[in-house]
Amino acid sequence: MNKPFFSVIVPLHNAENYMRMALDSVREQDFTDYELIIVCDACTDSSEKIAHEYSDLVLNVNFGRAGLSRNAALDIATGKWILFLDDDDYYLPGAFRKIADALSRMPDIDILAYGFDWKNVGAVKQNHGQVFIAVWNKAWKRSFIGNERFPDWIHSDDLGFAKKMHPRAKFGFLDEPLYYYNFMRPGSVSDKIKAGEYDNSQFPDEILADVKGYEDWLKRLF
C-alpha cells in the first residue's frame, strides 16, 4: 500500500462550533494525496461525531494537552510529510499543492516553513516565510521527526518541540501565505497568553532556561 504524501494532524477539544471550517479547508484542497488524522481530546460535545464525517482516522483521548494529542497522531501517521492544523484555523485554497510543489523542488530539506495570514482584534496581518516557533506553518519530513515527540507541557509545547528539531534541520522557505491563524479567538490559549493571563511561573523551567539560546540560534539563522 502506497504511503500518502501528507499526514494532516488536527488535535481538537470541544470544537463543534468552528472545527468544520478547519476540516473543510482540508477537504476542499485540490491536492488529495493525504490522510487526515483527527484527535478528539477530552471532548464532551459533538466534536467526535463531526470528526467521523471527515475521516476514518479519529482518535479519542483524554490528555488535555495539544502536544500529547499530536504525539498520538504521529504514532499512527504514515505520510511522508506531516502537516499540523489547529482546530480553529484553516488552510488557504491550493495550499497542499503549493507545498507539495515546493517540496519537489527542495528534496533535501527537512522542514518547509511557509507564510500565514492571521487575525488580531479584527485586523488581518501577514507573516511570510519565517521560521516562527509554531508547528502549523510548516511541513515536517516524517523520517526527520523519527521518534521525537512533543513534551508533556500544558503550554508552549510548540517551543519544546521546535527547540529539539529546528537547530538540526535543513530548512526551506515558501514566501507565500498558505495558512490562516485565528490568533485571538476568545477563550483560546493564545488569546490568554496575548492578554497576559499567564505568568512565567506557569511555564516549565526548561522553557525559561533555554529561550535565550533558542532566540540566539534564530538570529544566526537569519
PLM regions and their residue ranges:
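Short aromatic/hydrophobic "clamp" motif used to bind/position activated sugar donors
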Residues: 82
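Catalytic core of nucleotide-sugar-dependent glycosyltransferases
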Residues: 180-184, 191-221
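Conserved donor NDP-sugar-binding/catalytic core segment of glycosyltransferases
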Residues: 90, 94-124
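Acidic helix N-cap motif at the loop->helix transition within catalytic regions
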Residues: 17-20, 45-53, 90, 94
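Glycine-rich, basic loop-to-helix element that forms the pyrophosphate-binding segment
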Residues: 61-77
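A conserved acidic beta->alpha catalytic loop
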Residues: 25, 32, 40-49, 86
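N-proximal low-complexity "stem/linker" segments adjacent to membrane-targeting elements
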Residues: 1-25
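Conserved nucleotide-sugar donor-binding catalytic segment
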Residues: 123-196
